[in-house]
Design a protein with these regions (language model features):
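The substrate-binding groove and active-site-proximal loops of carbohydrate-active enzymes
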Residues: 10-21, 52-64, 117-133
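Aromatic-lined carbohydrate-binding/catalytic grooves of carbohydrate-active enzymes
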Residues: 29-68, 89-92, 99-102
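Helix C-cap/helix->beta junction micro-motif
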Residues: 73-77
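Hydrophobic faces of well-ordered beta-strands that scaffold small-molecule active sites
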Residues: 8-14, 39-43, 81-85
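Mature, folded catalytic cores of secreted/periplasmic enzymes
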Residues: 1, 71-72
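N-terminal carbohydrate-binding accessory modules
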Residues: 1-9, 19-24
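Active-site-adjacent "subsite" loops/lids of carbohydrate-active enzymes
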Residues: 88-133
Length: 133
């Protein structure tokens, strides 16, 4: 599916991390977003997606099957589902502790000198620097 160029981009962005929210999100798509002519849904997963290859690097409970259900609901209504997964250099919440990847591999941290409970302005987000390799 492709967003039609003759229609403006009307998108909804949300962050999901819990399997129990999937049915409510599908209800939102079908009962509210579709009738309001939304044509894109950006689903930010961050550590909420349970990776099949490395499930230990996830905090959430969203599964592949959950994403398939969301995508099917979107497509039934002409909405383009757009997944958003953070890259390796963004592996923490704003002013929060590092996500599981950095907990298991602190050698990747560019900001390893900071304590887990550091807050703004001492810490914005944990980051990884390719030069740490």
């Amino acid at each position: 599916m492709e967003i039609k160029k003759d229609k403006p981009f009307v998108g909804f962005h949300t962050r999901l991390s819990d399997h129990t929210a999937v049915d409510k999100f599908i209800e939102l798509i079908e009962e509210h977003l579709a009738p309001m002519d939304f044509n894109a849904v950006i689903v930010e997963l961050n550590p909420g997606y349970t990776y099949r290859c490395f499930p230990e690097y996830s905090n959430g409970t969203i599964t592949y099957e959950d994403l398939q259900k969301i995508a099917a609901a979107c497509r039934r209504h002409g909405i383009e589902p757009i997944p958003l997964i953070q890259c390796l250099s963004h592996q923490s919440d704003f002013s929060g502790g590092p996500w599981p990847l950095y907990k298991d591999h602190p050698e990747f941290l560019e900001t390893e000198r900071l304590p887990d409970d550091a807050e703004w302005p001492d810490l914005y987000v944990y980051s990884w620097c390719a030069s740490n390799d």
